[in-house]
């Protein structure tokens, strides 16, 4: 059986990640408080931001920018999205 977490983004119990997505305290926080669904959605948003804004992940400022956008995404705060992106209708 998969583990569940109380997801920070969706404010309900959902399937959790199998392992922390990154090392350190930030990875552990995501592992304990973010659902698999929210993480997968963030990965899609992150990819669009990297491509749209031509982010170089070797640049510490770009990594800090993505970290800040990730926090905003998981906390349901306004976050930058790719220009012209229209979410699919559900």
From Swiss-Prot:
- GO molecular function terms noted in the UniProt entry: iron ion binding
Q: Kindly give the InterPro entries that the UniProt entry links to this protein.
A: Fe_traffick_prot_YggX, Fe_traffick_prot_YggX_sf
Q: Name one Pfam family in it.
A: Iron_traffic
Gene Ontology CC terms, in alphabetical order = cytosol
Alphabetized, the UniProt keywords read:
Iron
SUPFAM superfamilies in UniProt = YggX-like
* Biological process annotations from GO: cellular response to oxidative stress
Tell me the NCBIfam families matching this sequence: PRK05408.1
Protein task: Could be a mediator in iron transactions between iron acquisition and iron-requiring processes, such as synthesis and/or repair of Fe-S clusters in biosynthetic enzymes.
Q: Which family does it belong to?
A: Belongs to the Fe(2+)-trafficking protein family.
Name of the featured protein: Probable Fe(2+)-trafficking protein
The source organism is Marinobacter nauticus (strain ATCC 700491 / DSM 11845 / VT8)
